[in-house]
Curated annotation (Swiss-Prot):
Alphabetically ordered keywords of this record: Membrane, Photosynthesis, Thylakoid, Transmembrane, Transmembrane helix
Protein name: Photosystem I assembly protein Ycf4
Family in the record: Belongs to the Ycf4 family.
Keyword Transport: no
Source organism of the structure: Thermosynechococcus vestitus (strain NIES-2133 / IAM M-273 / BP-1)
TM spans (from-to): 30-52, 72-94
């Protein structure tokens, strides 16, 4: 899933521009949560098998492992992996970091919304009048750890990020999105 607009300005609906932001429900997070779950369960069952002297795994023979130190170490790694997998699955279920950027000329406000972890600040929302938006800033850093981000420069608030955390957006999509937002709001683009 990309940050392509859900609704582009059209003759009927040229007053609202809305972009979804992909949070923790990225395909890579599903892959890692599944891999860590399977590996953690395997390690935990191998450690438990060495303690109980009963084979709990469909493949391999962990009964031959000596419980101390091998079985206990494998069991510990299995528990640690299962805890990490639980964290990943909960972050996916809660869609941490997901949300949207909405630019609404009808109400005269920009609304940036993200989901956080459960608790007091589960819903993270930044809202400001369109008149406070000074520019759309594009940051591009290439190299070993590339960074391609869009920021909204807001009077009195500094730079507010518009793009998701994780894999950088393709350059063409980043430039198109930045230009579309700047044109829609009537502000300049910085950083190109």
């Amino acid at each position: 899933m990309t940050n392509s607009p859900i609704t582009e300005p059209s003759p009927r609906q040229e007053s609202v521009l809305r972009y979804p932001v992909l949070g923790s429900r990225r395909p890579s997070n599903y892959f890692w949560a599944t891999a860590v779950s399977i590996g953690g369960l395997g390690f935990f069952l191998a450690g438990l098998s060495s303690y109980l002297h009963r084979n709990l795994l469909p493949i391999g023979n962990p009964i031959d492992l000596v419980f101390i130190p091998q079985g206990i170490a494998i069991g510990f790694y299995g528990v640690a992996a299962l805890l990490l997998a639980t964290y990943l699955w909960l972050a996916i279920a809660w869609d941490v970091g997901g949300g949207f950027n909405e630019f609404n000329k009808e109400t005269g406000f920009v609304r940036i919304f993200r989901w956080g972890f459960p608790g007091k600040n589960r819903q993270i929302e930044v809202s400001c009048p369109i008149s406070d938006v000074q520019a759309v800033k594009i940051v591009i850093k290439e190299g070993l750890n590339p960074k391609r981000s869009l920021y909204l420069k807001i009077k009195g608030r500094g730079e507010v990020p518009l793009t998701r955390v994780g894999a950088p957006l393709p350059l063409a999509e980043l430039e198109t999105q930045g230009a579309t937002i700047a044109s829609f709001l009537g502000v300049p683009v910085e950083g190109l």
